[in-house]
Amino acid sequence: MDSWKFVHVCDTQPGSPRSFRYRPAWLENQQTAYSQIKRLQPELVLVGGDLTRDGTLHDFELEEAKRNLDALEIPYYAVPGNMDVGNKFTLLQSPTPNDDLSANVTSANLERFARVFGAFPWSFVHRNVRFSGCYAAVAGSGL
């Protein structure tokens, strides 16, 4: 059997110079990671969310994240993270930031992500290995 490689990457959260929370080091970290991925020459890349810093606020961050992944010139499959589409789904506001209703994942944010990165959840077979990706925060939410 031939050997082959794939990469799983997540939480790069680079932000954007156009966003209010931008820090240049975040983008530099992502660029370093993507440079290392290109050197590894994997057959595919799995992206496990948090491709953006403020993707729930700025469409341009989702679009920049896609351009950066496209530049790898390696097939990739992405699922969102809370920074991309919203946090866990909660029904009640609480005094702690952990249950902030305004940070809930929404169907609109899920649809925005899918328009940029494609449908999810996804599942496919590559070299007799099944890969599946989903966004667990929507479990039990009805979304």
Give each language-model segment a name.
Residues 1-59:
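N-terminal active-site segment of His-dependent metallophosphoesterases
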Residues 57-143:
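Extended active-site neighborhood of metal-dependent phosphoesterases/phosphodiesterases
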